[in-house]
Amino acid sequence: MKYIELAQLYQKLEKTTMKLIKTRLVADFLKRVPEDHLDFIPYLILGDVFPEWDERELGVGEKLLIKAVSMATGVDPKEIENSVKDTGDLGESIALAIKRRKQKSFFSQPLTIKRVYQTLVKIAETTGEGSQEKKMKYLANLFMDAEPLEAKYLARTVLGTMRTGVAEGLLRDAIALAFHVKVELVERAYMLTSDFGFVAKIAKAEGNEGLEKVTIQLGKPIKPMLAQQAANIKEALLEMGGEAEFEIKYDGARVQVHKDGEKVIIYSRRLENVTRAIPEIVEAIKEAIEPEKVIVEGELVAIGEEGRPLPFQYVLRRFRRKHNIEEMMKKIPLELNLFDVLYVDGKSFVDTKFIERRKKLEEIVKPNGKIKVAENLITKNAEEAEKFYKRALEMGHEGLMAKRLDAVYEPGNRGKKWLKIKPTMENLDLVIIGAEWGEGRRAHLFGSFILGAYDPETGEFLEVGKVGSGFTDDDLVEFTKMLKPLIVKEEGKRVVIQPKIVIEVTYQEIQKSPKYRSGFALRFPRYVALRDDKGPEDADTIERIAQLYELQERIKGKV
């Protein structure tokens, strides 16, 4: 299958904002895809190369990409860089450079999707001495044979800046439409495997019957079940039917552990492989968990000198560390508090009641210094739960989780079967979708940032406010440096930013607002932290903001 066909799809997707049209375009394309291409083409359509849980990265920045194009075309790198000032898009500028190419090689052949994909895999797997030079040559070979339109979208794929408006929800619907299968079965299969390529192949080859049989696969992370927030203990008990399991809500980073004999893989909430960053937890898991094949979930907490929990940002520092890991192990010791089990020796526990999963977890885990089972209380008594809540807060934890005893595990769902109970309203994780230049001595820096909430159905990020407080001067320097390469266009003092960076904000309240398409605005938002453990699709959604607004109004009504 020729790459120009995929490039033409990207072009059509970029030209329409209509979700139904985009879905039909992707579905029609998928129908024509050969079966042996289906395991990777869904990722290329999303603008990626690999699933989010795959460790491989291309490791190609703008400068290396421009050098590769220069090698392929003979156009000076500075000319390509200067062109971006006019086009506002490196992909467009590279397409122009390809048009200026003197001539194609005598041995030139049309690009195929398979060749492009295999070359990108080769680039990701090229490491060590001289790797940058090799990557540049691999890319140059592709650009030598590329048409301008192909070059534009190949460049965007390499940089991860596709911008065609195709998100997970749209791809899910397109797979269902293309292969005449139920959308809820595509959704379920994807939530269990986090692998659109695998799901698309099953949908085409085996239809609804095949999708119904899809189950957990060791080594492929399951989308985590999420919780809403309750106003208080009484509301949580009422929602749970009068009795619930309460467990400590730790201020850490959620992880999913896959153990297959001596092999252990640990995924973050974002489903990134963080195994190498936390070797002591890997070893502790091998000692603490007896069965050979297991998937468990827990909260990874950083522990301070007096044994009290440190803020979750300390865990993120451990995740980010690539070198001197042993030194970081001493500086920031970790503890894993397990709270769920999803798979044991060939049996899935996803459709098992929570109370039975909890018992199984306690059966298979032998706590040690690094691995514990989350402390819990099963009760019908609100006063007893209040005492447990108070003790959790005194110990330095965030609050409690309330879990319905008969609840099955619902991958990717944020329902009311799990509820958070915290003393404050939940902070929000939002995406920076724009920025405004500062004034005076800060005129060369961004001074405030436009916040967007995610709409998973359309893949859009809808504005919910602007944040300018909570940043230090150093923060503004860092954010300006981080966001400048992501500028899509400038409109006076305001710039439109490609949605890539997630930040955590606090706020005084959520208000309904006709000013924004989202329908909501944050009153007095304040920056708390950079959430580089989350991708834009992991940001809080419009639906989540609506839920928090309702919770806020309920709390007001009870004051």
Swiss-Prot record:
Q: Which UniProt keywords apply?
A: ATP-binding, Cell cycle, Cell division, DNA damage, DNA recombination, DNA repair, DNA replication, Ligase, Magnesium, Metal-binding, Nucleotide-binding
Q: Name one GO biological process term.
A: lagging strand elongation
Cofactor(s) in the UniProt record: Mg(2+)
Q: Which positions carry the signal peptide feature in this UniProt record?
A: none
Catalyzes what? ATP + (deoxyribonucleotide)n-3'-hydroxyl + 5'-phospho-(deoxyribonucleotide)m = (deoxyribonucleotide)n+m + AMP + diphosphate
Q: Which domain of life is it from?
A: Archaea
Q: Which residues form the active site?
A: K249
Residues noted as binding ATP in the record, renumbered to the chain: E247, R254, R269, E299, F339, R414, K420
Q: Does the keyword Cell membrane apply?
A: no
According to the UniProt record, what class of enzyme is this?
ligase
Q: What is its EC number?
A: 6.5.1.1
State any single GO MF term. Answer: DNA binding
Family designation: Belongs to the ATP-dependent DNA ligase family.
Query: What this chain does, per the record?
Result: DNA ligase that seals nicks in double-stranded DNA during DNA replication, DNA recombination and DNA repair.
What is the name of this protein?
A: DNA ligase
Organism equals Pyrococcus horikoshii (strain ATCC 700860 / DSM 12428 / JCM 9974 / NBRC 100139 / OT-3)
Name the lineage: Archaea, Methanobacteriati, Methanobacteriota, Thermococci, Thermococcales
